[in-house]
Amino acid sequence: MKTLKLARRLISVLGVATLSLSAQAADLTFGYINGIDPIKRAIADGEYEKGIGQKIDWRAFDAGPAVLAAMASGDVQIGNLGSSPLAAAASRNMPLVAFIVSAQIRSSEALVVRDGSGIKTPEDLIGKTIAVPFVSTSHYSLLGALKHWNLDPRKVNIVNLTPAQITAAWSRGDIDGAFTWSPALGEIRKTGKILTDSAQVSNWGAPTFEVWVARKDFAEKNPKVVADFAKVSLAAIADYSAHKKDWTAASEPVKSIARLTGANAADIPELLDGSYFPSASEQKTAQYLAGGTASEIGKTAEFLKEQGKIEKVLPDYSGFVSDKFIGE
């Protein structure tokens, strides 16, 4: 119950936050989480500053809820987060718009159990301590896995830790397992085994994805900035898709991602392979920004409500998604 109360408190904070109107085009602050994707290479190499033509203050966050809090306060105008925190925020009518689906999460997020923990089957999770960043895509996937296994989440000691805290808690032996992403995932896999991952959970009916969102007031006043941001992002994805075999651990793109995120360069090619990155042409299709993304946000919200993480589900989430910034 304690973890459930913490999750509700976090969602409540996001829900009551209001967006100030202080953002100006000449003062850009963008936030990201340290998931592994081609866009991180563009951030590390300064391509957004070149493409947008302005100085950008980049801020790294531990997880999506922290990005949302910064956007709600007015500190950040454009941010990177997962489908679960987006669904929670949209259900509270936070004025945001998702304008890029940056990744369909597959094996890049996983539930790892510690060697020697005694966890060999899903049923062994009962009574064990499992860490996850609350209201994140990993949290959603963990709850989806427990539902698939017919396990009551209340019988598992689920604790709220950021990826960095997960790595530290793992090294101390404080937790038996964790559902997370890299760099933490790459570290804990060294002394643990994967029980399931987001690809498998997606097949069980709980898919997750990552997006870039803008504050609605900022997007309305600065559509070219948002469109230029999308252009740089999708060029980075296209470069990876066209030269995937060249993105080895010793390559410059992978070194750039490692420098930005702190992930081990040797792990990055496999982690990149653990997600699917929709192309510019795919973004505007019914599968993504032209309908599918809004539908998936709604399904995620329904699941979060079922799990007691949010209080209501909106009848329509299409107002939180737009494809108009693609190709402008």
Give a label for each model feature:
Residues 1-11:
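Bacterial N-terminal signal peptides that target proteins for export
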Residues 12-13, 23:
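Cleavable N-terminal signal peptides
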Residues 19-25:
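Sec/Tat signal peptide C-region and signal peptidase I cleavage site
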Residues 26-152, 157-160, 176-179, 198:
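Short, glycine-/small- and polar/acidic-enriched structural segments
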Residues 68, 76-80, 166-194, 215:
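Ligand-binding pocket segment of bilobal, Venus flytrap-like solute-binding proteins
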Residues 103-113, 194-219, 230, 317-327:
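Periplasmic-binding protein-like
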Residues 220-309:
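Secondary-structure end/capping motifs
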